[in-house]
């Protein structure tokens, strides 16, 4: 049996399948990995596209849209026997040889539980620009805001090889292209279905770190990500999920004392974000922020245990205040 399952979760993405699935099939070693498409209850012609245009691709069909988190949990549970699983977005283009560096690095480093490639924008020109969803590896700042090597807020760096020295320890790896040891994924509890989508990979990576495993970016590999394939930037639904899930992430993973203090700080920042959205006449985003805090208060009772170790304090790189750095000090790069 092949050691790797590359699982693409699809929801109403027939056009993305036509555009990107051929690159995955062409770029992925058939000796190393099976490519599996898990359809999350699509209502477009995704099933017809898969059956008629990609008849040899392994497929799983779900009866409804379970979201990114539960969709992957179900797919991984059904795709049994693989030592490694790659979570690959349906809007990712893979060049030839992308998977080998990830696999061989994990095989040579048993202390590593998950890895990611460098994530570049899928562009029409030859520029190598890091992509928002993961760039060259993710971190959390002192207030729990995610940022990346190569991307802080909306500022994206060109890849000039500045992060290529060696595979680096990171706090979180992108869910757009994440290779994880399957047994560790299950041990860590998989993706949290309550998140539905957005930031669930950060939560998973936090729990992987709590097991003592490392998460690294392997710069010898890169893939191209379109981004916004499910929910584009500026969509109030995306705003809602990002704000709500960021609060859930901190509440469920931080020790209780640190978590309470940090959530007070985040309420202040989110209040500022609410008024900024109003000032820009983005009423949908402003309402989404309010709903996010309302629903967080309803959902936080679902999480009653807190780890005894504060991982944010254990990783010095995460002590930055990127809000101050970015907006006041004008520090726009990692």
Q: What are the residue ranges of the model-derived segments?
A:
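Conserved donor NDP-sugar-binding/catalytic core segment of glycosyltransferases
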Residues: 93-133, 138-145
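Short, flexible, basic/aromatic active-site loop/helix in glycosyltransferases
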Residues: 137-170
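Short, acidic, metal-binding catalytic loop of nucleotide-sugar glycosyltransferases
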Residues: 22-32
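Short beta-strand/loop segment that forms part of the nucleotide-sugar
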Residues: 32-41, 60-62
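Active-site-adjacent helix/loop segment of glycosyltransferases
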Residues: 7, 211-321
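Glycine-rich, basic loop-to-helix element that forms the pyrophosphate-binding segment
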Residues: 62-80, 87-92, 97, 101
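A short, conserved alpha-helix in the catalytic core of glycosyltransferases
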Residues: 163-165, 169-222
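A conserved acidic beta->alpha catalytic loop
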Residues: 23, 39-48, 64
